[in-house]
A protein has these predicted regions:
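Glycine-rich phosphate-binding active-site loops on the catalytic face of alpha/beta enzymes
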Residues: 38-42, 138-144, 160-189
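Conserved N-terminal beta1-alpha1 strand-loop-helix module at the mouth
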Residues: 1-61, 68-71, 86-87
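Histidine/lysine/aspartate-rich catalytic loop segments that bind and position anionic ligands
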Residues: 95-126
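Ordered, amphipathic secondary-structure segments that act as subunit-interaction surfaces
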Residues: 73-97
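Conserved, mostly hydrophobic/aromatic
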Residues: 27, 94, 134, 171
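Short, acidic/polar
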Residues: 17-29, 73-80, 117-126, 164-168
């Protein structure tokens, strides 16, 4: 794992997940936010969006699955983000995207939706792609987060449905290193 990314997450365990320009403006004005998860944009705008994050001195992580125009499951999407933006890394649910990003020396977050026991049992297998972080969604399942943290060697993030301080503390107490949220009130904690 790249130490800079790990250190930024450790120093600021609340990650701003941004889904629109209004949220971007708010997170850029929030000094405590060091890492930004970009959950919006298209192939025409993502370079400018990333540039704003970088100009604010924050790490920019682009959710490769959510950039309009990068459809399909081809690794060329990761190549595009690497060559056409200043993104520090990617977020994806696709192991092949994570592998390609690692080859390009980008930071990586593999998102895992834990919706049932089969998904939970598959988490350990996903670790074989060696992401920098596993992000468990939804992030409001402390017992499940605790099980995953005990089963894997990759640091865990919790994301999705985190609405208040209680959710943040429960996820962190369960072993998550940080949380990501679109909830702007949580960013201010």
């Amino acid at each position: 794992m790249e130490q800079k990314f790990y250190d930024a997450v450790a120093a600021s365990p609340i990650i701003a997940a941004v889904k629109n320009m209004e949220g971007l403006e708010q997170c850029l004005a929030t000094d405590s936010i060091q890492v930004v998860f970009l959950l919006f944009g298209d192939i025409c705008s993502i370079g400018d969006i990333v540039a704003q994050v970088k100009q604010a001195g924050k790490l920019a992580m682009v959710h490769a699955d959510l950039v309009t125009g990068l459809s399909g499951s081809k690794e060329i999407a990761v190549d595009f983000l690497h060559s056409a933006t200043q993104a520090d890394g990617i977020i994806s649910t696709r192991p092949n995207f994570i592998r390609r990003a690692r080859e390009l020396h980008l930071y990586t977050v593999l998102r895992v939706f834990v919706i049932d026991s089969m998904a939970l049992s598959g988490v350990e297998k996903l670790e074989s792609v060696h992401p920098d972080f596993l992000e468990v969604l939804p992030g409001v399942m402390p017992k499940t987060i605790r099980k995953i943290c005990a089963a894997v060697h990759t640091p865990v993030l919790a994301g999705g449905l985190i609405a208040d301080k209680e959710d943040v503390l429960a996820a962190l107490s369960a072993g998550a290193m940080a949380i990501s949220t679109t909830n702007q009130q949580v960013w201010m904690m």
